[in-house]
Amino acid sequence: MTAASTSKWGLVTNVVNSIVGVSVLTMPFCFKQCGIVLGALLLVFCSWMTHQSCMFLVKSASLSKRRTYAGLAFHAYGKAGKMLVETSMIGLMLGSCITFYVVIGDLGSNFFAPLLGLQVTRTFRVFLLFAVSLCIVLPLSLQRNMMASIQSFSAMALLFYTVFMFVIVLSSFKHGLFSGQWLQRVSYIRWEGVFRCVPIFGMSFACQSQVLPTYDSLDEPSVKTMSSIFASSLNVVTAFYVMVGFFGYVSFTDATTGNVLIHFPSNLVTEMIRVGFVMSVAVGFPMMILPCRQALNTLLFEQQQKDGTFAAGGYMPPLRFKVLTLSVVFGTMVGGVMIPNVETILGFTGATMGSLICFICPALIYKKAHKNAPSAQVVLWVGLGILVVSTLTTLSVSEEAPLDLTQGARSGQRGDAEGAMKVEAARLSVQDPVVVMAEDSQEKLKPAEDKEVLEQAQIKGPVDVPGGDTPKEKQEAAQLDRPGQGIAVPMGEAHRHEPPIPHDKVVVDEGQDQEGPEEKKPPPKLPDEGDPAGRGQGAPLLPESEKKQDPERGEEGKRPEQVLAVGEIERPQKIPEANGQPPVQPRKEDSRPGNRDLHPVPQARVSVELNDLVAGEGKESAQKAGGAPWKPMESAVESNIGGKAGLAVQRPEAAEQREKNEAEQPGGDQAGSKLEEAGRAEMLDHAVLLQVIKEQQVQQKRLLDQQEKLLAVIEEQHKEIRQQRQEGEEDKPKPADMQPEPGAAVLRGQEEEAEHAGAPDEHAGETLEDNPSQPLQPVLGAPRGHPAPSQDKGQHPLEEVKVLAGRDLADLPAGGSDTEPHGASSKLREDQKGAALKVAEAVRKLVPGDLEPVHKPDPAEVPKSPEKQLAKEVARQRQDVFGEGSQERKETGKDAVAPGADTQKEAAQPLVGAEAEDSHSKSRHSEPTKVPASGPAGMGFQAQARFRQEPQVIFDKSQDSHPEVRSEGPRGVGIPAEEQHRGRGAAAMQEEKQRPDPNSGPKLAVPGDQKPENAKPNRDLKVQAGSDLRRRRRDLASPPEQELAPKDGVIISFNSLPNVQVNDLRSALDTQLRQAAGAALQVVHSRQIKQLSGDLEEA
């Protein structure tokens, strides 16, 4: 039972969604036409008839086994019956679509026009309908399968209808529901409106097209279940309609029009409901277009099958599908544009197609199967009566409607001001129970006129204005009679002496009183607040409220209204000037945001000039508008809101004199000169920008030249490295160290080397620890010069990379920042692997005996002099490039370079050349491999590398050792001092093994320093040391030499050496990136320079 009840209420909800539509908006109007009692009875009667017709269809379907409306008609009456049903269905759907468009035009235009600052005109309404049909309705209608989303939208629309009902109820409370005054206003029974309202009621319940699909969707189709489902749905809808009709009619009584939403004052809730209606209606179009399109397809194109039946829901070719959809969408849009109001289209459609579909056809089909059916007879005759009488009644009333309803009501539909006035009239009528509604509105308006006259006399009395009070009264009457006061369309003299007068005068003063243009702009809003004026509010109060509200509006938006209010031909000429000059000021401000620091004075001057220009424009406008004595008086009225008559008298004269003086002065010339000055200021700004750009270009050229020099140096180093490889193969012993596991080898190498390492190694470790902040910067600054300690750590990655080429790939994710260097270096490795292997064999033989004894003395002694030289060269080069480089930076760079550099210099100078390229590629691999060796320190470095990934990439391209330095520097931060000393000790041990190249250590230190142009020899040393290390690593592949692996693990740190080559590749890329990046790179380079100089000083 639970599942069954759940499914039942789900079907009830779907049926209610299909029944409730925009016709709910016309319920108060129908109650007004028929009276409260008769309207409620008619609703109940139409609900009963709808239920009966639905049961006719269900019973006929159960007997004939047909599941479509057209199929039942064909079964009963042949092809004629099928065509009747299909044409009626098409007409009903088209009428519904037209109704949707009318509602969108009424509600949407009243909502969107004020937002856009436009008037609610017929042209805007047409434009809105076209935009909605093109942007919302058409895309949804062109979808073949939209039912799921449409149902969700329909459920959302039902929520809007519910909220709408509550708003109606609350409005009735607000309009005196419990005071009982409405009892004398409303009518209870009016037989005249029966035939006009019954078709609307009938169409409001139209759900016959949903009957058979719902019946077919039941798990166990039965007539009893269908009867309960539709009875529940119709009861809910009937209660909903009665509530909306009753409370809506009580709220607005005789002022009620076809679309009740138009009466509501503009506030957040009502605007939300209006927008909700518009969107629900727009989204509900496919619900109407889908069956309409299908019916058109079957009616026009479907062929009868051999068995005499028609295929239901056949496939529709794409072209036909699109043509039918377009014709329906835009055809109904034309109908929505042509038909004036909702009640007319609903009444006509309901009287014709609605009566056929809802009552006549179901009754005829049922009578064919069941001869004796009294209920079918009743429904049939009522339907025929509606078809004939209601059609005539609706057409006749629609012709008279423009005189009765649409003269005031249609204009009310086009403007919120009219609706608000009607609401106020209803509200006032509630307060006076004796007066009839029609008289009430007039009587309430006339006192408002009297108050208005008195108010204005109070302010303007002392001034002798030509025109006197008599024209004022006439003008006020004219304006109050006009429905669209909310629209700023003054009608000649009618506006001049009304509250809008300050509006016109303000336009004149706007130019004269240069100080407060915003205060004078309020007048355009006066017409918008014409309703309060009509209601008897004081005119002087309007300018203040407007002044508060006007600043929010843009000047441009207000001035056009002012032009309209003045109604003069010269006025439009002022507008382009006033609107054209403000853009000048914004442009200057826009061009300045980046250059405000450069030219603050020109900006201020320009703004002053612009203000003068605006003032000049105001004067010109005043001159053009000047000449009428009442205009100065208007300005006086606005300025003297307090009602000071004496001031009002004096000010008109001053204004007239001002206008005369201004007429004599050529304001256009002043404006032109000011524009020229503003243009000059802009030219200055542009010139400054050009200079800055030129300077940046010059700097970029310098960088490019330096990078080219670096590339040339690197090429020379490569050549020397190759030669040194050959020599190193013959001279250097082969290291007996093997690293079965790169991570373990690195750890062991660091430990052993830490033991063997001398003071220089310790010093190197200290330099890193002393400057914990440096590792972060070296990541960026590495391109120019990297401390040697990072290189020592880089040596470990070199060995690891060589030992495990495949593992490098696995480790790469750990050092994600190095993936790019790895790709660049892989090419170099392939070229140099052969030579490196040979060198490695020679290294194996030479290393074992030389490792320990050689290690300590060399790093301390040999590297210092070359390191200092390198540091100086680097500093000079960087100063040349960037114009920066302090002695402190050089010293720090030297300190960092010294320890690792010495060990690396001793390690292998000749080998550096051969292995530089390999280490180049491996260093990038080695950084990922370092991650396991260094542990969390490596992790921190990776995070840092990622954090500065862009700068690293840019500078790594220009400087080969940089990637190693990046990984090593941050690791140095994370790694304890002991590990750093160990790493350096390992480097020293390796250098001892590589003793044949005692100068390789300084060269290793140089790699960062060699990146400058002057560091060629240092790069050679780096390359040699790297080549030696690589050879040893390759030699270490043999198991007997694994024992020495921990020491050689330090060799991995030589990866920094290979970075020299990487820098070559990156330098080329660097040039391009720098060109794109511009000044941003310069900042990064400056940081690098600082770091390098600091490292040199420490060394």
UniProtKB/Swiss-Prot annotation:
Q: Which reaction does it catalyse?
A: L-glutamate(out) = L-glutamate(in); L-glutamine(out) = L-glutamine(in); L-alanine(in) = L-alanine(out); L-serine(in) = L-serine(out)
| UniProt feature coiled coil, ranges | 698-734
| Taxonomic superkingdom | Eukaryota
Matching entries from Pfam families are given as: Aa_trans (PF01490)
Question: According to the UniProt entry, which residue ranges have a biased composition of type Basic and acidic residues?
Answer: 441-454, 493-508, 517-528, 544-561, 586-599, 653-663, 720-735, 749-766, 793-802, 852-894, 917-928, 957-969, 1010-1022
For region Disordered, the annotated ranges are 440-679, 720-1047
What are the record's GO terms for cellular component? membrane
State where the protein is found. Answer: Membrane
Q: In which tissues is it expressed?
A: Only expressed in the pituitary, adrenal gland, stomach and in the upper gastrointestinal tract.
Q: What is this protein called?
A: Solute carrier family 38 member 10
GO MF annotations in UniProt:
active monoatomic ion transmembrane transporter activity; inorganic cation transmembrane transporter activity; L-amino acid transmembrane transporter activity; monoatomic cation transmembrane transporter activity; neutral L-amino acid transmembrane transporter activity; secondary active transmembrane transporter activity
Residues found modified as Phosphoserine: S441, S607, S635, S886
Organism for this UniProt entry: Rattus norvegicus (Rat)
Chain segments annotated as transmembrane = 9-31, 36-58, 84-104, 123-143, 153-173, 229-249, 272-292, 323-343, 345-365, 378-398
The protein's UniProt keywords, in alphabetical order, are:
Amino-acid transport, Coiled coil, Membrane, Phosphoprotein, Transmembrane, Transmembrane helix, Transport
Q: What does this protein do?
A: Facilitates bidirectional transport of amino acids. May act as a glutamate sensor that regulates glutamate-glutamine cycle and mTOR signaling in the brain. The transport mechanism remains to be elucidated.
Q: Which residues carry this modification: Phosphothreonine?
A: T767
Please report the record's description of how this protein sits within the membrane: Multi-pass membrane protein
Q: To which protein family does this belong? A: Belongs to the amino acid/polyamine transporter 2 family.
Provide the GO biological process annotations.
Answer: amino acid transmembrane transport; bone development; inorganic cation transmembrane transport
